[in-house]
Amino acid sequence: VQADASGQVRCCRKVILPLAFVILSSLAIAHSSRAEAVPSSTPHSLKGHWSFQPVRRPTVPDVSRLTPHALRNPIDAFVASELAKQGLSAVPEADRQTLIRRLSFDLIGLPPEPEEVEQFIADLKSDAYETLVERFLASPHYGERWARHWLDVAGFAESSMFIGDAVRPGFWRYRDYVIRAFNADKPYNQFVTEQLAGDELFDWRSAHTFTPEQIDTLAATGFLRCPPDATDNQLITQFEKVYATQQAAMEVSMKALMGLTMNCVRCHSHKYDPISQDEYYKLIAIFQPAYDPENWLAGIWSAGNPGPIRAIPVLDRPGREEYERRTRNWQAERHNLNEQINGGLLRSWRDRHMKARAEEIRDDAARAKLMSLLSKASAERTPDDEKFIDSQVEALGATQTALEKAYPGFAGALAAARTRIEAIRKENANLPPLIWATFDVSTNPSPARLLHRGDYEQPAHSVEPGVLRALGPSGDPFHVAKVPHSRTSGGRLALARWLTNREHPLTARVMVNRLWQYHFGMGLVATPDDFGERGARPTHPELLDWLAAEFMDNGWSIKHIHRLILNSATWRQTSFIAATVRREADANLASDDTTAAHASTGAAAAGFPSRRLEAEAIRDALLEVAGLLDRQLFGESLPTQRLPDGRTDISTNSTTRLRRSIYISTRRTTVPTLLTAFDAPSMDTNWPKRNDSVIPQQALALMNSSFALECSEHFARRVLREGGPIFEKRLGRAFALAYARQPEPDEVALFKKFGESHGNAAISSGGDKPLTLESWTAICHALLSSNEFLYVD
């Protein structure tokens, strides 16, 4: 443990090693250094890799003689061309009930109302489907659905993960920013710029008050705060964790925006892609003013972090200045009081007590060691010293409880310190709203240095801000321009402009691939976060480039790409033979893993791929069908709690517990059990593509969870209320709500028998002996537990 010039305690990892190990390590390092000094030709040869070439709009193929089906837009032409190479063709369009259910879940994440289905089926106008697409795109719930996808890409969570998984109050503002951005169809280049450098777009420090738009722009930089942060709750500043947090902010953002994995480049130049270790640290240098290891801001207040934090209060300028002064003072006081309680007071009284009773230790060596350690000043003791002293506490009755009883002076001092801490807490209980943002901490940051083997204790030469040479547009080098009249470096703003340059080869390709993936279940590139040499090849390379060019040429409009995909004949195909086609294609074409991914994705275009709803959509659909869903938009997250049986659920005390799942507090270690059963991630990192498992726990969760049973009962009450007195009408209403269709005759007969077995009553078509609520609850429970409810065709 060391102290720097400012007196801040820092932890180092240096240990004394045996001489032989030191010698062997030195030889290994010397050998590896010589090996790394020889430049590899591999990265240079890969500058011709497909994804590193500028996007050029390809010619739409003429496939009029290759397919009997109508082509609705260029997407269909590209897909038909690839299918023809595999001896396949597109399949017919799905029926209207299937299309509206598919479209509703795709765009807003909820099942359609039966009245919406009936209206769409009855609409004979030629543009009925296109009108439906526009209506769903205009829904405020569209932003909730598609924000959830982006939050996966960003790795959004409202806690730190480490050391108690400390909560980040107010971080929900970033989530709300993303929802609003999707609803407004904010141009993607602007969306990227605000998330990387929203704080550099205006002089927020000088602003007298913040407009709602400015609050959103600052909240957007929460994108860089999404990765886990081990520095949020440290008692001492551990440089290893500081650097890890800084590196994660850069790595996750570049993976999300450029689709390149860069973790390995911390330690050495990329073995496959044209990314040098020097370039990695040039990117780090762009983030250095905001994430400066020598001038670190904690993410939250804690006993270990008493000073200012990485957050901006939503107050006018005088209020912000007063808030900073006041919080700095009371945090420092609280920190000192905690130190007194946990360190000074407790340790001094403990040491006094143990010295007085040390003779009770029978082991002579242990007694001598204890007396020697107690004679040291506490500041001179090592962690191992304190660990040994603590091991004797119980035996000598030096616990805090025992000390309070034995020494009234200690108890009084302890009570006074605790009383003052509680008074501070009450004085500051009503903190102003906070924006958990990213911003430059200093106008003169410490120099960024290349770290040998990624070790912060082995800094090499300093590096200037820069980007990847293999991706830079020719004739337009990366340049950081100082923002006039601003206390910001302008580095992240320059990075955003480099990424959104029309000639950048990756940004548009990566995003349109993500959009395709969320519409079809698999991207045109099966590895959405790895467009490098080791990633998958695009199944439809010309289609990918055409979409990327179309994206940029139409103002980076995400909804424009939605319209193209959703209105295509490719997306509107039926799905009943898709699985068979994919199996045949895999058997014929897949000779290795890469080809298998290519075959599956290509064949998926010969029929829509049936797939299971995500965890959040399942929960939301259960609430919607039951008539329980609270559709309130935006605001604070729903708290979760750990139950005595080990499960995690939304707090039963929450008055808004029936809101959509995107509003559930995303603590990394306490994801609701129902959601984890259906593959909701814990966000230990970002999740560009979720797992899609089929496990027994999923069926058990729907059969036995109190939430599913509650929804089933409310669903049954809704059916009884809206379905009329006749069994067939009620069952029809239940099917319409759950499946967006009417039951077949054999299904009516099956559920009649099922209902009678639960209600012990025969059912007449006239409704003379209607089933009980218990029977209808069982019927509704069966519908909600079925594959047809969980899957979209």
Predicted segments with their positions:
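Bacterial N-terminal signal peptides
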Residues: I16-A28
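Primarily short, surface-exposed interaction patches in extracytoplasmic proteins
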Residues: S64-R101, D106, L110-H141, F156-T209, ...
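Post-cleavage N-terminal segment of exported redox proteins
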Residues: A35-P61, R148, S159, A184, ...
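Extended alpha-helical coiled-coil "stalk/arm" regions
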Residues: L346-L370
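Globin-like tetrapyrrole-binding proteins
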Residues: I779
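N-terminal secretory signal peptides that target proteins for export/translocation
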Residues: V1-R13
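Sequence context surrounding c-type heme c attachment/ligation sites in exported
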Residues: L201, H208-R328, A332, L675
